[in-house]
Regions:
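Extracytoplasmic/periplasmic substrate-recognition and gating elements
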Residues: 57, 156, 238-246, 277, ...
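Extracytoplasmic/periplasmic solute-binding protein
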Residues: 131-139, 144, 169-222, 268
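Extracytoplasmic "Venus flytrap"/periplasmic binding protein-like
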Residues: 48-120, 155-157, 261-262, 269-270, ...
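Hinge/lid segment of periplasmic solute-binding proteins
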Residues: 89-143, 204, 291-295, 360-364, ...
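Long, aromatic- and glycine/proline-rich binding clefts that accommodate carbohydrate-like moieties
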Residues: 295, 344-395, 402
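Short, solvent-exposed loop/beta-turn-alpha elements that line the ligand-binding surface or hinge
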Residues: 35, 107-120, 163, 182-191, ...
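Glycine-centered hinge/linker elements that transmit conformational signals in sensory
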Residues: 173-175, 218-252, 297
Length: 429
């Protein structure tokens, strides 16, 4: 109840504007990749900090670019001696920044600020830890789940997915929801949607007992081409090659926007999803155009449920000019007030366990409870562990295209890709 009260109170505080700037203020720079909606919400988050720190203003510097470009911009500014005071760190950038030694270890500062790391979700916190060092305080995260259209389930008389469903259940439902709804002989509603990009099928691979890399992250052979991985890849690409339960673009390189638009228009019943799509879904649910539910990623019978989490955190450059203030700002942005205000935007789950639980208690849709349950089975992505992951991830769609477009056997395609990734990873050792 106390957490729920904090959440409501935080929203009220977040609605207030910051005090008017005065001469002689110290300006701190917060670097992130926020779009205009996120930047507006972050200004609400920053207002209480500026109010409680007279003489301090915080200026957001939003990149408005992709993650790779953002990383290079930040690293360049650090190398040039003009780092931001605080930066938003994506999980995929943790290895590059920690390997270069450009981030401040926050652990020695946290006791003085009263920051108890036990309050954070331990899996999410581990994304930003290296031994005893803490290089960022978790801001928020999402596990990957399934988003589904309740109306399509109801029209077909299919019960909503339960927490412990299997691949067999998913396939049976997807077939039942792939339909010719107007009787013209053409399928115009599909059970699900396929995507060749790894971040959207990682959870499917793991929930089938497979993986891309072996322990340590420096070899793919023996893991990507293992029997479990091959079977998971065969099953996932089989949505296209065997089951015909997905809309098929002529080259299968449809964008995320294409699949989302098909979902919003009632043409796709189930979609692999993260919390980051909730802000896009809300307008459709609030005006009654969609009734949406979420469910955990189903697992292969005999394999344990698993999913992947994607997270971001607040870091301080080792060369930050205002080190004390920078650490205070990072700690504030990752603490309960900021996370509660930010939760209203729906982009992510709060990384503080109590804040996430409070959000779930207040959520009348039941969505947040599903994300919380999914996080119990979540793993840290490889991108948070090895620096060359961007190159690995960029190569993986080629394997999927070999299978779905060129009709290469998944075992052959996986073996080819494993050898290719071995060579790529060897260059970085």
């Amino acid at each position: 109840m106390k957490c729920a009260f904090l959440f409501v109170a935080a929203l009220a505080v977040g609605a207030c504007g910051a005090a008017a700037p005065a001469d002689g203020r110290t300006e701190l720079e917060l670097a992130n990749w926020a779009d205009y909606r996120e930047a507006d919400l972050e200004n609400r988050v920053l207002a209480p900090f500026e109010w409680s720190h007279p003489g301090i203003t915080v200026q957001q510097q939003s990149a408005g670019t992709g993650q790779a470009e953002y990383r290079e911009r930040i690293l360049t500014s650090i190398a040039a001696g003009h780092p931001p005071d605080v930066l938003l760190l994506d999980n995929i950038d943790v290895p590059a920044f920690t390997n270069r030694g450009v981030l401040l270890d926050l652990a020695p500062y946290l006791p003085r600020l009263g920051i108890d790391l036990a309050r954070y979700d331990p899996t999410v916190l581990d994304v930003f830890r290296r031994g005893a060092a803490v290089y960022a305080l978790p801001k928020g995260y999402t596990p990957m789940v399934i988003m589904y259209n309740k109306d399509l389930f109801d029209q077909a008389g299919i019960p909503y997915p339960t927490g412990d469903w299997t691949w067999d259940d998913f396939l049976r439902i997807a077939h039942a929801l792939t339909r010719d709804t107007d009787g013209d002989g053409q399928v115009d509603q599909w059970g699900t949607a396929y995507d060749r990009r790894y971040f959207l099928w990682a959870a499917w691979l793991w929930s089938g007992g497979g993986d891309i890399l072996c322990a340590g992250g420096w070899r793919a052979s023996g893991c990507l081409d293992s029997p479990a991985s091959i079977e998971a890849i065969r099953w996932y690409t089989g949505w296209v090659t065997r089951d015909s339960i997905v809309p098929r673009a002529h080259n299968l390189r449809r964008s995320l926007g294409d699949n989302l638009r098909l979902f919003y228009s009632g043409k796709v019943a189930m979609l692999t999803s993260g919390h980051f799509w909730i802000p896009n879904v809300r307008p459709y649910t609030e005006d009654g155009r969609l009734r949406v539910g979420f469910a955990e990623i189903p697992h292969r019978a005999g394999s344990a449920p698993q999913t992947v989490i994607y997270a971001s955190g607040l870091a301080v450059p080792a060369t930050a000019l205002h080190r004390k203030l920078s650490v205070q700002l990072a700690a504030y942005l990752a603490d309960s007030l900021a996370q509660s205000i930010r939760a209203a935007g729906g982009l992510e789950l709060p990384s503080l366990t109590a804040a996430a639980q409070a959000l779930a208690i207040l959520d009348t849709t039941g969505w947040e409870a599903v994300f919380l349950r999914a996080s119990r089975h979540a793993r840290i992505p490889w991108g948070a562990r090895i620096e060359p992951w961007r190159e690995v991830e960029a190569a993986l769609p080629d394997m999927m295209d070999r299978i779905t477009l060129e009709h290469v056997d998944p075992a052959v395609a996986a073996r080819e890709m494993a050898l290719r990734l071995d060579r790529l990873l060897a260059q970085d050792q």
